[in-house]
Amino acid sequence: MALVMNLKGAIGNLDDKDINIKVDKGVVYVDISDKLLFKSGSYAITDRAKEVLGKVAKVLNAQPDIEFMVEGHTDSIPITSPGIQDNWDLSVKRATTVVRVLQENYGLDPKRMTAAGRGQYLPLLDNATPEGRAANRRTRIVILPQLDQFFKLLETKK
């Protein structure tokens, strides 16, 4: 899949532990560790995040027909930062921040993007260990399949 190769090429020089690209059932997932994007307990984006998102945006801008969702994910440790109600709130605010950066800094069309918060409810690993919690704190860009092409495949030929 050309899109996956382009993404891997664009962000290939970044630490593999902090970014993971995978394809599952026709959907492309780009997982970015929270430590690359945000300070702990915050939804303010880091300078490093802008560099990473710029590389992803370059690939997405080259594919104007693709829609995608930005999901914020947290661990299960309760949040105590002022102005943040809980982990679900933090995950939504982080996803919204990423979407805004992609739109305002890199010109991605907001009609192509959805921001969603998953809180601690879709963990990759067990939250009982520090490693598991670190893996669960991430932002995921989900590149959605093009449904019009999918439906064309389902149409019966007459």
Regions found by a protein language model. Name each.
Residues 1-22:
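Extracellular/lumenal/periplasmic "stalk" regions immediately C-terminal to a signal peptide or transmembrane helix
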Residues 23-27:
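Short Gly/Ser/Thr- and Asp/Glu-enriched loop/turn motifs at secondary-structure junctions
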Residues 37-55, 59, 63, 73-158:
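Periplasmic OmpA-like peptidoglycan-binding domain that tethers envelope proteins to the cell wall
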